[in-house]
């Protein structure tokens, strides 16, 4: 947070562009970018503007999410900070499509998260939530109650919560890179979710705590550590991932769908996870155009 506050907009553009290009080279064609490392209005705006700028470069599509409610900053008490997040929602709506809150023990309470998300909905944001990363602490149930578009993490969600998410039409976004990075064996129960018909997506969670831009690595972790099949990991990183950011025109190779395609040097799709540790992508095509990242 401190480094992000000190960085100029140009610094953030330069550093973010490197990561953005890495993601594209590894096969990501639509990228959700979240703020949350400013924890005060000016730096959150700076991050959101850089995220929007990346989407203008013609390298990949972007979806921008405001996540001012990522943590309580050290220089402010929680009541004052929640009030500041609420105050800024209307102004920040023009810079972001979605609003996300980290509802977890030690971060934002269920009631604080509900207050922020309901206000965000009234301001015109789509809703997302980080929930149940370490245990079933109410975030997943809140996601179901508010019918958010997606809920991230869910490693600690119980069967009751999984079924509530399913019944509310929420997409579960699983982030297997995160437990890997923090040396944890606490991966999301993907098999239980699939058995109970909860649609799941997977994502990198690329951040200082989980530093990877490679969706191929995430697919591999989904198979090796969460028990998903190669086909399930492919669905979770394409059409389901698109649905988790509100996109219904991509993620499938079919007539009338957006022509976002990857040409990979593999015998069939199963080698994306079977042959791990390398980049299989040879050519990235976005909206029918070959991309040089």
PLM features: residue spans?
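Short, Lys/Arg- and Gly-enriched loop/turn segments at beta-strand edges
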Residues: 269-274
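Non-catalytic positions within long, well-ordered alpha-helices that form the structural scaffold/packing
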Residues: 24, 92-93, 121, 144, ...
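Metal-coordinating catalytic core of metallo-dependent amide/deamination hydrolases
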Residues: 2-17, 21, 29-137, 208
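Active-site-adjacent C-terminal substructures of enzyme catalytic domains
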Residues: 126, 136-252, 265, 276, ...
């Amino acid at each position: 947070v401190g480094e992000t506050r000190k960085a100029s907009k140009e610094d953030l553009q330069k550093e973010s562009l490197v990561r953005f290009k890495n993601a594209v080279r590894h096969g990501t064609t639509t990228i959700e970018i979240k703020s949350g490392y400013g924890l005060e209005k000016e730096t959150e705006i700076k991050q959101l503007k850089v995220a929007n700028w990346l989407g203008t470069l013609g390298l990949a599509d972007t979806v921008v999410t405001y996540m001012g409610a990522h943590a309580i900053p050290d220089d402010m008490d929680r009541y004052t900070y929640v009030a500041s997040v609420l105050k800024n929602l209307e102004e920040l709506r023009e810079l972001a499509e979605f609003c996300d809150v980290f509802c977890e023990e030690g971060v934002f309470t269920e009631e604080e998260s509900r207050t922020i998300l309901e206000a965000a909905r009234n301001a015109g944001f789509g809703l997302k939530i980080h929930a149940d990363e370490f245990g079933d602490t109410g975030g997943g149930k809140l996601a179901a109650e508010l019918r958010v578009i997606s809920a991230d993490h869910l490693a600690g969600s119980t069967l009751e919560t999984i079924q509530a998410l399913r019944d509310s039409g929420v997409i579960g976004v699983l982030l297997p890179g995160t437990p890997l990075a923090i040396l944890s064996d606490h991966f999301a129960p993907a098999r239980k979710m699939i058995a109970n018909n909860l649609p799941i997506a997977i994502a990198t969670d690329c951040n200082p705590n989980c530093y990877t831009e490679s969706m191929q690595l995430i697919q591999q972790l989904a198979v090796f550590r969460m028990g998903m099949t190669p086909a399930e990991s492919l669905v979770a990183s394409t059409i389901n991932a698109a649905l988790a950011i509100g996109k219904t025109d991509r993620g499938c190779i079919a007539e009338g769908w957006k022509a976002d395609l990857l040409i990979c040097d593999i015998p069939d799709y199963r080698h994306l996870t079977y042959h791990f540790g390398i980049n299989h992508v040879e050519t990235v095509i976005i909206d029918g155009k070959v991309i040089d990242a």
